[in-house]
Every structure is written in C-alpha cells, then in structure tokens.
Amino acid sequence: MKLKNILLACLTLLLTFLLGACSSNVSDPGLDNWSKYEEKKQITIGFDNTFVPMGFEQKDGTYAGFDIDLANAVFEEYGIKVKWQPIDWDMKETELTNGTIDLIWNGYSATDERREKVEFTIPYMKNEQVLVSKRSSHILQANDMAGKVLGAQAGSSGYVAFESNPEILKTIVKNHRATQYQSFNEALIDLQNDRIDGLLIDRVYANYYLTEEGILDQYSVFSVGFESEAFAVGARKADRTLVEKVNTAFGKLYQEGKFQKIAEKWFGEDIATDQVKAYKNN
C-alpha cells in the first residue's frame, strides 16, 4: 500500500511537470502576453509555407520571403527570435485562438469578417484578388468564366471574396462553386493541366510565381472586380501590446530605410502603405 502511494505521488508530480512544460510553450489566449514573449525571447508565427513571395519553404528546407524577412527584422528590434510554424491556412484563426501560434503573418488580408476574431496591426502592403487563366483558353474577363471550372485556396481571401460577392463569379461558374485547394501550388498544377479553367489568387503570388517559373507569357492575369485588400498581421484580441510593438517597429524600420530594402529585394520597389510611412508611436 505504501509503495502504491509513493508511485501515485510520483505519477502526480510527473504529470504536473509535463503539463507545466506544455503550457509554458503555449500562450494564454486570454492575456496580453508581451511580457512572456520578452522573457522567452521567442514568438511563434503561423504561416502558409507555399505562399511565394511572402513566406515559403525553399528546396533546402529553410524559409524565405518578404514576410519572413520583415517579421525577423521587426522582432530583432526587441531581441526576440521568431519561430516559424507552418499551418493549415484554413485553420489559421483556430491555431491563433488556441495559443498554438502567436501571430498570423503571411499575406493575411485584413477583412471585416476577420476583425471580429483577430486584432490587426496597421496594414503594411496592398493587394488584390485576380483571376489567372491560360492564354490559350481566351478567358480574359469575368464573364468568360461562365460555365467554367474555378479554383481557389481553402480559407484564402480569394475564396472569401468569391463567397461574399456572388454576383462577380459565383453565379456564373460551373456548379456555382469553386474547387478548393490546400495550397496555391496544387491549384496551379491543376490549372496547368486543364483540370480547372481559372484560378482566383493574390496578385502578388501570381505575378511572382509565373515570373519565376518563366511562364508569365503563357497566362493571363486580370482583375475581375473585387475590391483591393490590405495585408496586415493578425494577433489575439488580448495581445494589444504585441500589436502596438509591431506597428512601432514598422514605422521605425521604414524611417531607417530597412523596410524599403526588404521590399526592393522581393518586389523591386517600395510597397509600404501610407500608414507604415506615417506611423509614429504616441
């Protein structure tokens, strides 16, 4: 009996230790966790590791992209290291809410629907949803997609825009739905192989990918009427200090010319929003 009690006590201590260790690696969703990030000197950012040129995995297994470089520069200002966590993009808000990641940062459009769940930083870059089609298909405007098969990434801004503005594409495409993909790469493969006729996608991704692959001349990239978007960083509602710190770093990096240097590397031009250019911590 005495041995049993000792074993139970040891098991209780072990479970307590393991739970404590696990909880220390997960941020509390209901608290402002800035002091914890400072203490650990680490923050976890969730991203889609196929979204070129914003954040993607290279052939050697390392991560690269505009958002990767920008986020690393932001947290370097505070002596905090970024842990990059690839996630299912369709589950991004869930991963944020449950504390698995601390930020969503990867070409994340700040929409009214998302603002209900997420605290956004100031927008740092503009974007729009465009349609990509093969030139040989002669699809050059939205109406040309009548009865055609459309593709989009699940959980993407493009898919949200498709559902929210049915008059633009949903009412005319085949079956009034978009084939959903887990990544843009998968969708582009299907477009190349004629399994879909058009792909709703971020302009920055389309231009960069098709240019890098040397196939831009084989495709048409055009607007179909969706409103332009703004990329911002998403945090939990309680993490207001974190949001302010990111905003402050945006402004500082721009004033020092570092923001522009990163933008030039990936886009060949300064893409900062007016909010970034004018931001000063009050």
Language model features with spans:
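C-terminal motif of bacterial Sec signal peptides marking the signal peptidase cleavage site
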Residues: 18-21
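Extended ligand-binding regions for polar small-molecule ligands
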Residues: 23, 68-77, 143, 148-149, ...
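Periplasmic-binding protein-like
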Residues: 49, 126-133, 203, 211-248, ...
